Structure formats: C-alpha cells, structure tokens
C-alpha cells in the first residue's frame, strides 16, 4: 500500500533483546551476505514506480498544505500566536522535508525504481530543491557504503584516534562545551561537510563536493558534478528572485528555517547511525565489508520513524542491501534479525538523550588493550 495507508511489518520485539551498550561482536561472523539475503522475502527487493511516487506525492502534498496555511492564515493571528504558529510550521515542515530528502537519497541508491535514469532525474530535482548537489553526494555516499567502519577509507563521521584529538577537545568535554559543539554541528555541519569536507575522510588536497576536479571524484564522474552544481545554482537563483519579490525575511521564514531543520536532522540521524559505544571501527588489518556494514545501529525516533521513511530504524538492513526500497525495509529487518543475532544492534534510547550520551561518551577511538585484536577500535572519552 502507498503512503496513505502503510502496512509495513514492524520488527519483532521492538525493545532491545540485549543491552544496547553491550559491544557488538568484532570477530568475523559465521554467516554470509548471501545467507542474510536468502532470509529476506524476495518481494522486499522489488521496486515499484507507482508506490515510490506515492510517497513523493504524499510528502509534497503535506509540505504544500503546511506552506499554504502558514502563508495565508498565520498573519491573521495575534502576535504571540502567529510566532508560535510559525515555530510549529518550521519544526513540522522541516520534518516533512527530511522525508523528501530521504526519498532523494533512495534515488541515489537506485532504490526508487528499476530505471536508473528516472531515479537520477527524481533525485536531482528533489535534492537540488533542498540545496544538495545530487550526483556529488551520491558518489561520496556510495563510497561511504563501500567502506563503512573503516578508519582509513570511510567517508563521513570518521572517528579520530586519541593521538589526533585537537588540543581544545578537553576544554569542550563538559556540558557547556557539548552544548556548543552540538549546536554548531547540527546547524553548520552539513554545509561545512559539503563545502569543506569537515568530518569527512582526509584527502591529500582540498576536497569539496562542489568541485568537479576535486579528489573525491574520478574523471568519468566530473560532468555529473557540473550538473549537480547547476541544479543547486538554479534553486539559489530561484530563491534570489523570490527574495526580490517577497523579501528576504519571507524566504527565510518559509524556506530557510525549515531547511535548517532538515540539515540538523540529517546530521543527527547520520551521527547516531554510526556513533555508538557498542560499535567497533576497524583498520585495514581487520576491516572487511560485511563487518563494516554491520557496524551501524538502528534507532527509535518514535513517530518520526514513519515521517523519515524508516531510515532511522532500518539502517542496518539499508547498509546490507542499499537498493532495497524503504517500504520493504521493516519487513526485511524482521527477517534478518534471527540470523544477525548479537551482530544486530537496536537502541531504543530517545534520540535526544542518545545524542547527548554519544557526544559525551564517543570522543575518540582506540584499541582495547585487553584483546589481541589491535586493528579493532572502540569509542572512549578519557582525555
């Protein structure tokens, strides 16, 4: 069923069957990727153009209704109520547009339909509308999926080893410092990553998602980076014309603040998917693709799980089979949990509490001195 009447099967036993802070096994698993795939009903890998588009229409319809109410009725309310109404609009519209962002992300994984060209067209339009360079991020994100959990080759939120921690980190390792760090990360983290590769893997020269000739991309990808840049510039020009016609404040209130919410949730979701005290990271001496893909965690965002198309609570399955559409990921997660066993981690900690805990506990990674596996690194916070 489409977006208007979902019949997804929830994962069995939503409460964690094991302590979510218990370390995930780091030894090579006894199961293979093909065994995991065989446990999933075949229809979960089928992509439907109509069903996928139903979610696009559903999200955009809600977004338009919110915009219409905010721009046509809120100004009629008394001052304090008008401001409260706009605050609600910013939060709700930001959440809905995060769902749109997730659909565009699926297009980049070829999980929207069986037609790569259609996926790229839809993804380019939706991501450009949110000022995301579609192909640029598609290619760097693909490398993230190919190297998840690798300390040398993963693309984003690569944890630092203790020897690489900045001198000022100890001064931020306190409640006020964490508030400041989280505020900057959630508001500026996404644009800084795209423009300056902040929190990304190190390259031998300056890396930028807008640079077709940057080290992130190969020669055959450069033309599509130009297309991504053109898409973002077209939207920026459209926003400029809107600002000239309606005023800058109107554009900021209607579009800019919800976009900040989108960017904040994007960073938070990614951070919490790959940052957890129970998750290992690996150097090249230990890393392999399957263990890296399993070094992620499913989270519980309450009702926002559905708003975000379950990218939050089916992320393990997504890393194993990224071309699977989101509307089958819940059923697939239920199917693979018995096979994954302790390699599967679901943490039901409320996401705000989890954000604070991870910011406090996960400052750097280091090998566990009690084991002989020196290529396996775990989070620590002792500065």
Curated annotation (Swiss-Prot):
Q: Where is the signal peptide?
A: none
User: CDD domains annotated for this entry?
Assistant: Delta12-FADS-like
Named in its record, the pathway it takes part in is: Lipid metabolism; polyunsaturated fatty acid biosynthesis
**Bilayer topology annotation:** Multi-pass membrane protein
- Quote the Pfam families the UniProt record gives: DUF3474 (PF11960), FA_desaturase (PF00487)
**The protein's Enzyme Commission number:** 1.14.19.-
Motif Histidine box-2: list the residue ranges: 141-145
GO annotation (BP), single: unsaturated fatty acid biosynthetic process
- GO MF terms, alphabetically ordered: omega-6 fatty acid desaturase activity; oxidoreductase activity, acting on paired donors, with oxidation of a pair of donors resulting in the reduction of molecular oxygen to two molecules of water
Which intervals of this chain are the motif Histidine box-3?
315-319
Please tell me which stretches of this chain the record labels as motif Histidine box-1. Answer: 105-109
> What does the function comment of this entry state?
ER (microsomal) omega-6 fatty acid desaturase introduces the second double bond in the biosynthesis of 18:3 fatty acids, important constituents of plant membranes. It is thought to use cytochrome b5 as an electron donor and to act on fatty acids esterified to phosphatidylcholine and, possibly, other phospholipids.
The record's similarity note reads: Belongs to the fatty acid desaturase type 1 family.
Supply the domain comment. The histidine box domains may contain the active site and/or be involved in metal ion binding.
Name of this protein: Omega-6 fatty acid desaturase, endoplasmic reticulum isozyme 2
Taxonomic source organism: Glycine max (Soybean)
